[in-house]
């Protein structure tokens, strides 16, 4: 009984990474851009219906809802070869099409005005599922639509579907470059509050690290958005392979999440992927083995979140799940795990077991692959707090000077005061404190002393 998942794509970034994700899924399941199963795709052992449903004429349609407050990206999707793939009723563009102007408050208050139309689409999609497991939200936290409308939808999804899982793929802004969005720290922090309180699991896609990986590992001089988005879609599709090619473990979303998130608030995950090569020459000199893949996944340069080195805190892994695809002998997995533990290649929390889980997954039979084995690591690691600290520092600089506040004052939520910002700042600070506490043996009793 497959548990269905509805994908919500929000704003420019969300729709771009969502588009790449569906292109990748179609390729992996042998579905043409029009949604028709290719003639060679006769294996039949994959579960297409977790992410797709079939129309009356048998062609496949993504369980996706495309939302944006300005039309550019969605129009480009509708002018691509994949235009016929989507259900046109599941596309929502705001009528005045002016976007949210990179302003969280504008995205949030537009959410209040249009949420009924959006939830008509989401409810219809949910009613069409036999046993809906949850929602996956793709968005960025820096702009206006993905952050503001995204925050509003996260709150409402919790109210409307309290028992369904909400997982997000959240793109964090590139910290190495000057941003063209001056209010980015405000947008990010206000969204982080909702990601902390209203999501069950957040897969952090950090543009800073993705750019580094593209330049250092893939040798692309100035990586374009579409190249970065391909990296992201690789991660998204790899993290859902066990749902789409089910084995005996981790074949639903809750199974994936439960092994990684032992305590509810610490649910921000980082990912690593290997082997990352675009050129065939490297592929021909390296024999990818399970140990090789698992060891590489633990190297910081393969991790898609750039965290600063923090000398004071002894950061550690809370849990790791490695999804290994390809020709794998299960006994090799056991040996690799032993070797990782013996050599102490990973530093784990002092208050719980060293949890490294491995899920073996088949590769798509329809995609040629240069490597025998590839792996995705999803890790819950306390150093992710440094990403939030960076956002807080930038927020504090602007907040102290009350810079750019007038853009926010226009909206109802900030008309009288900026309490919402200050509460968000406190909640993110509590999250950072809890990640720091999780590195210490007394974490189990953390939070009980303060009451």
Swiss-Prot record:
Its biological function?
A: Tubulin is the major constituent of microtubules, protein filaments consisting of alpha- and beta-tubulin heterodimers. Gamma-tubulin is a key component of the gamma-tubulin ring complex (gTuRC) which mediates microtubule nucleation. The gTuRC regulates the minus-end nucleation of alpha-beta tubulin heterodimers that grow into microtubule protafilaments, a critical step in centrosome duplication and spindle formation.
Q: Which domain of life is it from?
A: Eukaryota
Concerning Pfam families, the annotation shows: Tubulin, Tubulin_C
Q: Which residues carry this modification: Phosphoserine?
A: 131
Q: What Gene3D superfamilies does the database record attribute to this sequence? A: Helix hairpin bin, Tubulin/FtsZ, C-terminal domain, Tubulin/FtsZ, GTPase domain
Post-translational modification note:
Phosphorylation at Ser-131 by BRSK1 regulates centrosome duplication, possibly by mediating relocation of gamma-tubulin and its associated proteins from the cytoplasm to the centrosome.
Please identify the protein, giving its name as recorded: Tubulin gamma-1 chain
The gene from which this protein is expressed is: Tubg1
Q: How is this protein annotated for GO cellular component?
A: apical part of cell; cell leading edge; centriole; centrosome; ciliary basal body; cilium; condensed nuclear chromosome; cytoplasm
Q: Please tell me where GTP binds in this chain.
A: 142-148
* Localization of this protein: Cytoplasm, Cytoskeleton, Microtubule organizing center, Centrosome; Cytoplasm, Cytoskeleton, Spindle
Task: Write the record's keywords in alphabetical order, separated by commas.
Answer: Cytoplasm, Cytoskeleton, GTP-binding, Microtubule, Nucleotide-binding, Phosphoprotein
SMART domains per record: Tubulin, Tubulin_C
């Amino acid at each position: 009984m497959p548990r269905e998942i509805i994908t919500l794509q929000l704003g420019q970034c969300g729709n771009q990474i969502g588009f790449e994700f569906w292109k990748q899924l179609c390729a992996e399941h042998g579905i043409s851009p029009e949604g028709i199963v290719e003639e060679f795709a006769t294996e039949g052992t994959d579960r297409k219906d977790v992410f797709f449903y079939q129309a009356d004429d048998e062609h496949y349609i993504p369980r996706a809802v495309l939302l944006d407050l300005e039309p550019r990206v969605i129009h480009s999707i509708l002018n691509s070869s994949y235009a016929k793939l989507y259900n046109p009723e599941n596309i929502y563009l705001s009528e005045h099409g002016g976007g949210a102007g990179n302003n969280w408050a504008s995205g949030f208050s537009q959410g209040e005005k249009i949420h009924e139309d959006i939830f008509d689409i989401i409810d219809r999609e949910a009613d069409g599922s036999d046993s809906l497991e949850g929602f996956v939200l793709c968005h960025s936290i820096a702009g206006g639509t993905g952050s503001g409308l995204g925050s509003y939808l996260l709150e409402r999804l919790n109210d409307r579907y309290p028992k369904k899982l909400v997982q997000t793929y959240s793109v964090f802004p590139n910290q190495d470059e000057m941003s063209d969005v001056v209010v980015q720290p405000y947008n990010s922090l206000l969204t982080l509050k909702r990601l902390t309180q209203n999501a069950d699991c957040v897969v952090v896609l950090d543009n800073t690290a993705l750019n580094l990986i593209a330049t250092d590992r893939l040798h692309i001089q100035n990586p374009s958005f579409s190249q970065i988005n391909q990296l992201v879609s690789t991660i998204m599709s790899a993290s859902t392979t066990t749902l789409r090619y089910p084995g005996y473990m981790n074949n639903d979303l809750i199974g994936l999440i439960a092994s990684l998130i032992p305590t509810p608030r610490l649910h921000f995950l980082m990912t690593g992927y290997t082997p990352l090569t675009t050129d065939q020459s490297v592929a021909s000199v390296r024999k990818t083995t399970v140990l090789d893949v698992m060891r590489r996944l633990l190297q910081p340069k393969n991790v898609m979140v750039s965290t600063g080195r923090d000398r004071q805190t002894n950061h550690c892994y809370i849990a790791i799940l490695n999804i290994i695809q390809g020709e794998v002998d299960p006994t090799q997995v056991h040996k690799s795990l032993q070797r990782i533990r013996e050599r102490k290649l990973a530093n784990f929390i002092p208050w719980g077991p060293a949890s490294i889980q491995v899920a073996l997954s088949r590769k798509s039979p329809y995609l040629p692959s240069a490597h025998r084995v590839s792996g995705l690591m999803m890790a819950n690691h306390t150093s992710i707090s440094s990403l939030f600290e960076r956002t807080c520092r930038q927020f504090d600089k602007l907040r102290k000077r009350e810079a750019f506040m007038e853009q926010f004052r226009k909206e109802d939520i900030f008309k009288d005061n900026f309490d919402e910002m200050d509460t968000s700042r406190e909640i993110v600070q509590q999250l950072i404190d809890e990640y720091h506490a999780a590195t210490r043996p007394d974490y189990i009793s953390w939070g009980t002393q303060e009451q």
